[in-house]
Amino acid sequence: MKKKIIIFLLALSPILSFSQEKELFDLIISDENATPELLPERMVFTQRIFWGEKGLLRKTGIAPLNLKNREKELKLRRSFLKTHQILGYATLGTMIAQGIIGGKLYNGDNSLYKTHKTMGKVVNAGYFTGAALSLFSPPPLTNKKTKGFSSIKAHKFLASIHFSAMVLTNVVADDNKKAHKAAAYTAFASYATAVIVFKF
């Protein structure tokens, strides 16, 4: 009886082996046919407008959504964000200079008015160029929600504060000196903190 069971199992083993190989082969085929996720589920609205599946760059054919283009986009993203970081440090320096000039202007040194206006344009150019590089960079490959505190979450939260403060600083520049000063200090404090938080 035992011999019959052993012979039966030996006879059955090639069939079982073939069946397992077929299942494995089917899995490989289905994996090869699967479309890899090229875009993250979560994207900033500005990224979705340009780089999303139905974004402007996809619809116009400038950047069709495929693996080769996504590799190029990720390299472009890296250079955008590196430039964003460098501009961030430079802009922080110009903000400090603008704060010193602005302080002297508020203390009655009216000879610095034109310098203050010019420096304001320099700060704005650096700030809004840096912001655009971040907001319009191609999206990452994945963008999962993480629990708890992280430096990137703090950086993004502070960005919403300093962006609003920068816009307000420009809106009230000529009409309300007190509001202009308060908005400028808020922009500087939140911006400097965002730079420090992201560094550490």
Predicted regions and their residues:
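Juxtamembrane helix-capping/reentrant segments at transmembrane boundaries
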Residues: 146-154
